[in-house]
Amino acid sequence: MSKGVIIIGLGQIGMGYDLHLDPALHVYSHARAFSQHPEFHLLAAVDLDGHSRNIFIQTYQAPAYSNLDAALSQHQPDVVVIATPTQFHSEILYEILENIRPMVILCEKPLSYILDDARKMVQKCRDKGVLLCVNYMRRSDPGAIEVKGMIDSGMIQTPVKGVSWYSKGLIHNGSHFFNLLEFWLGSMKSSDLIERGRKWGEDDYEPDVRVKFERGTVIFLAAWEENFSHYAVELLSTSGRIRYEQEGSMIQWQHIEDNSVF
């Protein structure tokens, strides 16, 4: 039996990114992903904006509500997606847990801009027996999993040295690559601030930092999103070089070999 899903927040990641794209080729939003997966079905959505609600109703033939209480009084979801701006995550999570006990809460990243708040959210879900997942999806990509296998097998020898480019805030966007590198290289052991960088929005910064993981050291550098987008990771090993570019759509491994001339 398929699992019922409620989506809270019908912005870009909730519904908008792929709204006008071919559904056979493009799946970038929670709404489309859950609607197409055979093991899930959309129960409802929640958003303050009436226009967004109407689009959801017309596109997915499911109801949409202006407030969470109304949705939870009518539906008992197995999965609740929190796809609102970060500052509302904790408030919404607590309201969910006060009313129902879903199997899973899938929250957009970052969980919170405040570490203590994030820890409280995690503990609250543990206390209620609810699985809390944060949408750091890059480590689930087949290419990223293959890279991890290459590192685990020793094909990519460690320790590595690397650079990761990010923009739009270290917490908001850079954390995607921090999470990916934790997946590849193990837990963070230490970090050093190179340059504080500028403030991004109300709650984030774009520092340059050096992070030491269990299997190597990576320098995170902030790019300039207002001029162009650039998200990439390059790792050097004694056995070669791995490049992760275009947000993971291109991954290139170059192994070492003897040069017959030099």
Question: Where in this protein do the model-derived segments appear?
Answer:
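Receiver (REC) domain switch-region micro-motif
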Residues: 45, 80, 105, 162
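C-terminal glycine/acidic-rich active-site capping loop/insertion
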Residues: 7, 234-262
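Beta-strand-loop-alpha-helix segment that lines the small-molecule cofactor/substrate pocket
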Residues: 78-79, 85-86, 90-139
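Short acidic-hydrophobic, aromatic-tinged amphipathic segments that line or gate anion-handling sites
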Residues: 63-68
